[in-house]
Amino acid sequence: MKIHIKNGRLIDPKNGIDAVRDVFIAKGKIIAIGMPPDEFQASRIIDAQSFIVCPGLVDLSVRLREPGLEYKATLESEMGAAVAGGVTSFACPPDTDPPLDEPGLVEMLKHRAKNLNQAHVYPIGALTQGLRGERLTEMAELNDAGCIVFGQPDG
């Protein structure tokens, strides 16, 4: 699919751009900014006037309700809300209920997130079992399951 995003305020820190620009996308990749490539025919045109066009945002502390508190919110609803706000990746602290202190829980979370295919989820593993501050978790196993770092949130 070829997409033309027009009239949007492009903010691209990597390339030092903060200006109204058109963006041209083909096969999911940005192929041009400003002027269209030769023979570019968009199958979809998005008028982004009054909107910001930028790289995906990363939220470093998303308090997930899953596992354990799905009656409040599901991974799907929380990921949908994040993506609607421009967040494409997020880290989730271990203070869920139950805490992210078991490899099986982390694997389940990563598997569900991958199947939803909305945003990248980076679990933060519990530093101690049950977040009680007494015994360390099996950090190597948690890392193998997908934890990127470990933490001990204040209770």
Where are these regions (language model features)?
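Active-site metal-binding motif and surrounding structural segment of the metallo-beta-lactamase
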Residues: P37-V53
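Acidic (Asp/Glu)-rich catalytic clusters
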Residues: L109-L116, M139-D144
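Active-site-proximal beta-alpha core segment in soluble small-molecule metabolic enzymes
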Residues: E102-P103, M108, P123, Q129-L136
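Divalent metal-dependent hydrolysis catalytic cores, especially in the metallo-beta-lactamase
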Residues: S77-L100, N117-Q129, N143-G155
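Divalent metal-coordination and catalytic microenvironments
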Residues: G8, V23, G28, S50, ...
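N-terminal metal-binding scaffold of metallo-dependent hydrolase/deaminase domains
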Residues: M1-F40
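Metal-associated gating/positioning segment near the N- to mid-region
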Residues: Q49-A113
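Short, acidic/polar
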Residues: Y71-M79, L131-E141
